[in-house]
């Protein structure tokens, strides 16, 4: 039986409604999928940026911590150097004061003569040369001549060697020197300095650990002494 125009129109309308519904469902499906993919991508981007921000601030934090350590180390070193300089300055001042006090020794002729006797003999025994020259301050000439005359027989007794000792009357130690003598080999290539200043410096060098211990106490950072 042939369809009437009304039936045809109904079928067409029904088919169009079906197609439209299917199209709408498809569009909704596409929209839902697109939104899902968008949300996934957005989440990925947000997470990526969050990680980048965290990484940036972690790096900054490490840099700040490193700079802090460097600054603290620098400050500790500067403080340590400042303490060392202050300690060295104190020791230098004490040695300078000790050198000034050496002048008191020469004020007593008897004490100074006994000291010169020992310094001259010690200088001769350290060189052990057949010919030696003794140099002194000009104001000590007579005292040193007496010390040399006393030292020669003592030297020969100890060393079992003959010796010729000359006193240098052309070159002297400085007038403002503390005192003592310098002893030279005959060719003046070898010298033993037995001035009061040099003996003080040598004694201070040898006793420096004890001096530092007395002034500043034990060094807790040092595990052993050399």
Curated annotation (Swiss-Prot):
Q: Which residues cross the membrane?
A: none
GO biological process, alphabetically ordered = regulation of macroautophagy
Q: In which tissues is it expressed?
A: Testis specific.
Q: Which domain of life is it from?
A: Eukaryota
Q: Which residues form a coiled coil?
A: none
Q: Is this entry keyworded Transport?
A: yes
The protein's role, per its UniProt record: Subunit of the V1 complex of vacuolar(H+)-ATPase (V-ATPase), a multisubunit enzyme composed of a peripheral complex (V1) that hydrolyzes ATP and a membrane integral complex (V0) that translocates protons. V-ATPase is responsible for acidifying and maintaining the pH of intracellular compartments and in some cell types, is targeted to the plasma membrane, where it is responsible for acidifying the extracellular environment.
Q: Please give the name of this protein.
A: V-type proton ATPase subunit E 2
Which gene holds the coding sequence for this protein?
Answer: ATP6V1E2
